[in-house]
A protein has these predicted regions:
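Non-catalytic signal-transmission and effector/linker regions of two-component phosphorelay proteins
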Residues: 1-29, 33-36, 51, 55, ...
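Negatively charged, flexible loop motifs adjacent to catalytic sites
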Residues: 45, 66, 92-96
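A structural signal for isolated positions on well-ordered beta-strands in alpha/beta enzyme cores
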Residues: 15, 38, 85-87
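Cofactor-binding loop segments of dinucleotide-utilizing enzymes, especially the Rossmann-like FAD-
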Residues: 17-19, 42, 89-91
């Protein structure tokens, strides 16, 4: 089993910025699916993780009800990681969010989450096929 575990140095990392119990469910599912996941409990923590961690492959945001300006957070993080894919989880699309950021409705299935993540992490998808 250890041989199939990806190297943390080369594996794209996922940073999740969320403030509620959804964070635990999403983090758990992604970790059980073999992803390297780092939790950020608020926008400042997400900024810090994205500054400090190498090889970030995806940012997942759910800032509903926090007062966080999600589009500004995405733009700020993309100053350092200009091509970073982002997945927004929420009840609806957010005005001003960059056009390339899809929204996954909060009432999603585990399969919908994994398909969304796989679609945004093409390097991992390619590695799975090899």
């Amino acid at each position: 089993m250890l041989a199939s575990t990806p190297s943390l140095a080369s594996e794209p990392r996922i940073v999740i910025c969320d403030y509620n119990l959804l964070l635990l469910a999403v983090t758990g599912l992604l970790r059980m699916s073999g992803y390297s996941v780092f939790q950020a409990y608020d926008a400042p923590a997400a900024r810090e993780l994205c500054r400090a961690l190498p090889n970030i492959g995806l940012l997942i945001l759910n800032t509903t009800g926090t007062g966080t300006d999600s589009p500004s957070l995405v733009r700020e993080i993309r100053e350092k990681h200009p091509h970073l894919p982002v997945l927004h989880i929420g009840p609806e699309e957010v005005d001003g969010m960059p056009a390339d950021v899809p929204t996954l409705a909060e009432t999603f299935t585990s399969d919908q989450l994994l398909r969304s993540v796989d679609a945004l992490l093409p390097a991992r998808k390619t590695a799975k096929l090899q």
